[in-house]
């Protein structure tokens, strides 16, 4: 198999031209270069290559070479060292950039600041990147031993789909979004004025005068101080000893209308923050092209930014329906927006590993959450649903206890009762803990190794 390490330099991330291309034979290190107008000749040469080794090649180099250098590189031909780096250890100190890898491998990248025009320095910079990518690929081959190749194939295919999703974007009703933002900001301003009238400014005695600091409804510190002045006794603190003020804490203060006002303000803060991020990222095509990092967490879950389109409020939450209605289709006459959801994915995977006939039947034909309600001794089905997902994702006794309005001791008893009624789950949990103690990793669903940083 003919393998080549390839790197390119372009005029911009959204490239209109390729300044230079450097390719290095993976086994022998033999190097070829194309500069300026020669770059279109790369396409003919690339037809001889079976595998292209590139850093971010799926999302950047490969598509640009196909578009501007007459290449016909297929995604299956690309070995992307960026995806490998993220897959083998999603949370590396320093990240996954080629620059970071240069420091780890003691083969630092070159420095270049001007990319608009070709230069000899640019070519040498590209050569250096190609050599570094070759060293990185060799290093990752060793690191990836024991990983199921299907894990890489899965992440490669996901990256291809996500790149298409980002390019297409999601239609956004900009006008309605601006109207909703104005409405919520208006209520915010009203609450700010109301709070200023309700709470006197704080007096600060200076050397020669008294300074008056107006009450700031957005300051959690000031909120805590004013509530305590009215007799509230805080019960929750941060590790540094600061009083915790959030929507959960405020919702539990039933005898002070001020707490309800503060809670409302925090809600509006969150909603206006989301709306501003959506509006800011809406492009001229009327669509939001949100970014997705496909391998951002230790478990391989995705992360979203610019904006975070995975955090649109649920339809049943305050202003959830209004927020969700902003995400639409470009032409309602020809297209419809269809929502889908997978049913109980985590519990179906759990059933596979438990191999418990009764549990499997509850998922397929019964009501697994009602069954879990009985097993854990919970009051409601909703509590059981919240409990099982929190438990599966590592919630400890304190978090579990909070679900039912109790303490860490309550949570500990709930877990013990649930496991006593689910012996197969107790056994599975014990086996996983033993495996982690021995290896420090566990095997993922697709054969990848998941590094465990803490017991939960």
Protein language model features and the residues they cover:
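Conserved "right-hand" nucleotidyltransferase catalytic core of DNA-directed polymerases
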Residues: 1-9, 13-14, 22, 29, ...
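Hydrophobic "anchor" residues on beta-strands that sit immediately upstream
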Residues: 3-5, 51-52, 76, 337
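Active-site-proximal helix-loop-helix substrate-binding element of RNase H-like nuclease domains
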Residues: 14-19, 23-44, 50-144, 152-162, ...
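Metal-dependent catalytic core segments for phosphate chemistry
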Residues: 16-22, 339, 346-376
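Short active-site loop/helix that positions an aromatic residue
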Residues: 21, 58-71, 86-88, 224-231, ...
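Cytochrome P450 catalytic domain signature, combining two hallmark sequence patches
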Residues: 72-75, 189, 232-238, 354-366
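Generic long, charged, amphipathic alpha-helical segments
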Residues: 366-379, 448-456
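Short, amphipathic alpha-helical "recognition" segments used to contact nucleic acids or chromatin
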Residues: 383-393
């Amino acid at each position: 198999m003919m393998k080549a390490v390839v790197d390119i330099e372009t005029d911009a991330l959204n490239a209109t031209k390729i300044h230079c291309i450097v390719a290095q034979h993976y086994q022998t290190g033999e190097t070829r270069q194309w500069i300026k107008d020669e770059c279109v000749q790369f396409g003919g040469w690339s037809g001889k290559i079976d595998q292209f080794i590139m850093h971010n090649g799926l999302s950047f180099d490969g598509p640009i070479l196909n578009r501007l250098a007459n290449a016909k590189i297929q995604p299956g031909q690309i070995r992307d060292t960026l995806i490998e780096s993220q897959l083998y250890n999603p949370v590396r100190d320093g990240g996954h950039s080629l620059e970071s890898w240069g420091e780890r491998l003691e083969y630092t990248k070159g420095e270049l600041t001007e990319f608009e025009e070709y230069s000899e320095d640019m070519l040498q910079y590209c050569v250096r990147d190609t050599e570094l990518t070759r060293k990185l690929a060799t290093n990752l081959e060793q690191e990836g031993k024991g990983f199921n190749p299907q894990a890489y194939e899965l992440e490669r295919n996901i990256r291809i789909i996500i790149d298409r999703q980002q390019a297409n974007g999601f239609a956004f009703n900009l006008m309605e979004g601006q109207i909703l933002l104005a409405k919520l900001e208006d209520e915010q301003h009203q609450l700010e004025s109301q709070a200023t009238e309700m709470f006197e400014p704080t007096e600060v005695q200076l050397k020669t005068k008294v300074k008056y600091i107006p009450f700031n409804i957005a300051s959690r510190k000031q909120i805590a101080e004013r509530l305590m002045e009215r007799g509230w006794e805080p019960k929750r603190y941060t590790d540094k000893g600061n009083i915790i003020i959030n929507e959960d804490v405020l919702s539990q203060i039933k005898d002070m209308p001020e707490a309800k006002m503060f809670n409302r303000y925090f809600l509006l803060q969150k909603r206006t923050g989301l709306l501003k991020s959506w509006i800011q990222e809406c492009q001229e095509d009327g669509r939001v092209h949100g970014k997705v990092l496909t391998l951002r967490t230790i478990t391989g879950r995705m992360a979203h930014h610019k904006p975070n389109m995975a955090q649109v409020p649920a339809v049943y939450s305050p202003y959830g329906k209004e927020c969700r209605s902003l995400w639409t289709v470009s032409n309602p006459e020809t297209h419809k927006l269809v929502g889908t959801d997978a049913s109980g994915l985590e519990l179906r995977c759990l059933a596979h590993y438990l191999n418990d006939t009764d549990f499997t039947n509850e998922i397929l034909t019964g009501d697994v959450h009602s069954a879990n309600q009985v097993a854990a001794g919970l009051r409601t089905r909703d509590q059981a649903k919240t409990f099982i997902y929190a438990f599966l994702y590592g919630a400890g006794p304190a978090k579990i206890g909070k679900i039912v309005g109790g303490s860490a001791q309550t949570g500990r008893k709930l877990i013990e009762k649930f496991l006593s009624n689910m012996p197969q789950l107790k056994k599975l949990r014990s086996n996983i803990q033993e495996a982690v103690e021995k290896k420090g990793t566990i095997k993922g669903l697709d054969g990848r190794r998941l590094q465990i940083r803490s017991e939960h």
